[in-house]
Amino acid sequence: YADSLGLMMWQDMVSGFATSRKKEEHVNPLATTDWNAPEEHTRQWQKEMFEMIDRLRFYPCITTWVVFNEGWGQHNTVEIVNKVIKYDDTRLINGVTGWTDRGVGDMYDVHNYPVTSMILPENNGNRISVLGEFGGYGWAIKEHIWNPNMRNWGYKNIDGAMALIDSYGRLVYDLETLIAQGLSAAVYTQTTDVEGEVNGLITYDRKVTKIPEGLLHLMHNRLYEITPAKAVTLIADGQNGSKNTRLVSLNGQEL
């Protein structure tokens, strides 16, 4: 469906455990070392990650593989991210989204709630600077939430449509300065409400769009009019560079 819309996607690998039974499994944002994962764990986790890539790699809408998220089960970062880079050199690799960057992969990715503040690194090589999560303004519309009897939250609670429009508009405006400094992407939390979280732009039942689409379009269009920092080609395509590509069927036969 994303392919039919022309929607570009980032595909995350899931975290390596259901819950953090041991605190060292969740790497602290300021930690200088990764989790020393058992060999059996990292072997199984990598097996499932490469199976995911093999299963989904034929969908051109996927532009980026995301390996680790916010320190959850983060282990052997440099080794694993470099493996993914070699395994699929046709896509961008976001080695660590949020928190514990190890200087590997195509992106430097920071999470910040609810504001857009971000210190862009001065010496980042050719890595892309990304605000991988921000915002999270929560407006609970009671008739349209998953379970009204539980806590429904956002990173900052908002009361009503006008307050949300004003707050969201300020966030988008604040991105303009970062783009001029070299910010390449920003991911708002989030598209829809989910179980227990009401920070979506659309309600859980998909019946209410909290900010009118036309207004969102006007807000976002300003971001594309800003002159960014100098662009750098990281992966050549058929029109730019010398990347050779082949079209093959699912059984590996060239078309």
Predicted features and spans:
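Active-site mouth of glycoside hydrolases
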Residues: 1-106, 124-125, 149
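Residues at the C-termini of beta-strands that transition into short coil/loop
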Residues: 13, 97, 111, 133, ...
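Flexible loop/turn segments at secondary-structure boundaries
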Residues: 17-19, 71-75, 101-103, 116-117, ...
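Substrate-binding clefts and catalytic carboxylate motifs of secreted carbohydrate-active enzymes
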Residues: 46, 61-65, 121-230
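Active-site regions of enzymes building and remodeling cell-envelope glycoconjugates
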Residues: 104-112, 128-129
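A polyampholytic, Gly/Pro-enriched intrinsically disordered region
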Residues: 112-120
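C-terminal outer-membrane/trafficking sorting elements
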Residues: 230-255
